[in-house]
Amino acid sequence: MKVTDVRLRKIQTDGRMKALVSITLDEAFVIHDLRVIEGNSGLFVAMPSKRTPDGEFRDIAHPINSDMRQEIQDAVMKVYDETDEVIPDKNASSEDSDEA
């Protein structure tokens, strides 16, 4: 199985999330809502997850071996490094808003 497409949007935020990502596997299966996160040891790709009733986060989809995890990490980070455009976070306050 190969990563055949990566769609990435860098996000401008004060938080640790740096980008939202969708990947396509074998030109046949798409996984949305991966995230590039700034961790203590640098950037890494987090799999899509949801919060459980007890407050824990649980992956919705994830690779089951280290080779596939590394392929996803490499493909996403290559596109991340090549992407210059940063989209402002919708939740960030805008100081230059014209609304009164």
UniProtKB/Swiss-Prot annotation:
InterPro entries: SpoVG (IPR007170), SpoVG_sf (IPR036751). Coiled coil: none annotated. Gene3D superfamilies: Stage V sporulation protein G. The keyword Cell cycle applies. Disulfide bonds: none annotated. GO terms for biological process: division septum assembly; sporulation resulting in formation of a cellular spore. It comes from the Bacteria. SUPFAM superfamilies: SpoVG-like. Keywords: Cell cycle, Cell division, Septation. Pfam families: SpoVG. Could be involved in septation. Belongs to the SpoVG family. This is Putative septation protein SpoVG. The gene is spoVG.
